[in-house]
Amino acid sequence: HCQIGKEEGYFDLKEVVNGICTKLINRHPHVFNNVDLDMSQFEKTWEELKRDEKGETSITSGLKRIPNHLPALIKAEKIQHKAALIGFDWDDIKDVFEKIEEEYKELLDECKQGNIKYIKEELGDLLFSIVNLARFLHIDSEEALNLTNQKFINRFEFMEENASKLHKKLEDLTLDQMEELWQSAK
């Protein structure tokens, strides 16, 4: 990249290295300027420095900077983390659960109305709140969901194997029979 940049007159290796060094020094005052920061101060300072570097004038611009290509759970976690850095966060886990309950009730209400646009919106709000709970508990929501996905597959495999022992295919069982196998798998 540096060679192409040099050939096209944009930059050379020296400019790239100087830029990287400047960025490292600016973003790490606790290392290069003997500034004592705890982790929350470091993260807050880091975000402020990144905003300054990019000429951003608002916190929202930092939220918009989170890449759209990220999985939605990861993006939601990053959005909530940045909001929490400036103090927009729940004080207590009880508040998080109350928010989840509120969003759940709103989803139920919209399901009764049957408008898919609002159902989708409320489902998104509920998922966002659950990701916030995971963040609040210091649990990676992607990892937690992947564990549950694998648990479901393992239980489903158990059901299928046990149906086979009865000389039946899983899809030939009634829902009650499948539920019985599901409970056995747990």
Residue ranges and their predicted role:
Residues H1-L123, F128-K186:
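Flexible "arm" and connector segments at domain edges
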